[in-house]
Structures are given as structure tokens and as C-alpha cells.
């Protein structure tokens, strides 16, 4: 939901901006607000009974660089192959104060959207 990996997204876009690249258009993720998703469901004929954003900080099993290499490829598309490692290192260091604890454990700033909706029978 809205705000999911917001810290990560901001670090990626800022690192691209420092390289003269507009990263906003490279964002592949859709994390809707409650209002936006409710409206989408309603347009498809659903009656929303419950909808909420649920902050869900999620511990990562490894350092965040692996997460970036897996899920943030679209942000790296305009970079030359030999520039990607430095880019990832820069993003990791930007994220460290917010998403890494004093023991070196990383946490992703996930936000879930949870809802219950029914589609009335015609």
C-alpha cells in the first residue's frame, strides 16, 4: 500500500537525480492509497467493507543490496553495467541510517493494503 518502500524509492530516485537521471519515470511499483484502491474496487462493482494500510516493517535475510538487485532493476536500466555496483553501494549507504540497525540487520519499510470487498450478485 501507499508508503511501501518509500524510503528505498526515495534513495533510488535521489541517487539517479545526482547522476542527472529522472528516476520518477523508472518506478515500476504501484502502492495505492486507501482512497485510490477503494475507488478502483468500486468502479469494478465491489462494495468495500474494510480497507486499511498496515505498516509491516520486514526484516531482510541479507543486506539490502540483494533486495535492490532483485526488485529495483528498472531503476538501474539507464546505468551502464559497470556503474551499477557503485549505484547500489550509494543507495545502501543512504538507507543505512533508516533501515539498518546497530547489529547490521536490515528491515524493508513495507506497507500492506488489506481489504475486504464483496461483489453483489447480479
Outline where the language-model segments fall.
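Residues at secondary-structure transition points
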Residues: 2-3, 32, 82, 86, ...
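C-terminal helical/coil "lid" or tail adjacent to the Rossmann-like core of SAM-dependent
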Residues: 44, 49-103
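Short hydrophobic/aromatic beta-strand or adjacent loop that forms the aromatic wall/cage
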Residues: 109-116
Amino acid at each position: 500500500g501507499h508508503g511501501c518502500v518509500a524510503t528505498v524509492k526515495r534513495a533510488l530516485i535521489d541517487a539517479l537525480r545526482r547522476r542527472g537521471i529522472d528516476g520518477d519515470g523508472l518506478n515500476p511499483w504501484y502502492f495505492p492509497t486507501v482512497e485510490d484502491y477503494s475507488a478502483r474496487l468500486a468502479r469494478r462493482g465491489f462494495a468495500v467493507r474494510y480497507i486499511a494500510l498496515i505498516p509491516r516493517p520486514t526484516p531482510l535475510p541479507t543486506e539490502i543490496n540483494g533486495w535492490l538487485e532483485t526488485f529495483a532493476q528498472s531503476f538501474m536500466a539507464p546505468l551502464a553495467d559497470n556503474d551499477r555496483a557503485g549505484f547500489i553501494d550509494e543507495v545502501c549507504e543512504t538507507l543505512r541510517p533508516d533501515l539498518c540497525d546497530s547489529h547490521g540487520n536490515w528491515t524493508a519499510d513495507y506497507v500492506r493494503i488489506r481489504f475486504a470487498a464483496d461483489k453483489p450478485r447480479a
